[in-house]
Amino acid sequence: MGNDMISIVMSTYNEPVEWIQKSINSILGQSYKNIEFIIVCDNPKNNDLIKLLEEYKDNDNRIVTLYNDVNIGLTKSLNKAINKATGKYIARMDSDDISDKFRIEKQLSYLKNNNLDLIGAGVKCITEQEEAITNLNKFPKESKEFNKKILYNNCMPHPTWFGKKEVFESLQGYREVDFAEDYDFLLRACYKGFKLGNINEILLDYRMRESSISNKNGLKQFITSQELVKAYNENYILELNKLLQQIKEKINHLSNDEMNTYLEASKLFAQGVKGLNPIKAVKSICISKYYRKKVMCYIKGIF
């Protein structure tokens, strides 16, 4: 098992240097040593970031750095890293998260022992200051259960992905599906017959950034996820042009009031979870029909 090369792919843009250092160090310090760490710099104007990455590369030959000439976004950057990967397996990492020391070792063992093709893991949600918020690890473990739960919500945290390279090659990487490229990938993987699951151990600290909580595109992301499920159920999930047209039509019909109400509900829910305030959490699902539907999908995806 220790001879299998594992490629870990990560994209960086404008994250604080301290976060990036902790992220990189958590990968370089893995108990499993036979890795290549492919880091894409998607901000060619960030000289401090470039200097930092080159220093790491000079000190550890397992690091491979790729520099984009212009900002091309997460999807294309990850595909660029995947195409560069030489490992039998590919793992994901985000530049603001922190992996458990035994993450790669445990995921490789779990994937092999359970005859799976792509897996995720549980996460500990932390604030920007690394204060613990909550643990999320009630994700479907077996492929049969996963195929049912994935139709309600994304049940594999993106930065915890670990899978066979052939999965990424078969799907030709990520597609340009705004706000939901990871959910699109998982649905296509299930549709094509790959076996997905999760190891229900906390193997990553997931940093919940304030900018993501107050994301103005939250409702667009939810509508996109709903359209992806519809495309899966109606057998056109692989037809990208048709899918994107359906998403565009749905989003164009949203009003500013609906988007603002959804955003407010999202903030209330986050405040309720952080402060263990059930009143705020309940209020969040009352003020927006879309957020109410999202919460119901989440509950169905767990139980």
Label each region the model flagged.
Residues 41-51, 70, 94:
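A conserved acidic beta->alpha catalytic loop
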Residues 102-134:
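Conserved donor NDP-sugar-binding/catalytic core segment of glycosyltransferases
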Residues 3-7, 28-39, 60-64:
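Short loop->beta transition adjacent to catalytic acidic/histidine clusters or analogous donor-positioning motifs
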Residues 23, 68-85, 106:
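Glycine-rich, basic loop-to-helix element that forms the pyrophosphate-binding segment
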Residues 15-29:
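Short, well-formed alpha-helical segments that are part of the catalytic scaffolds
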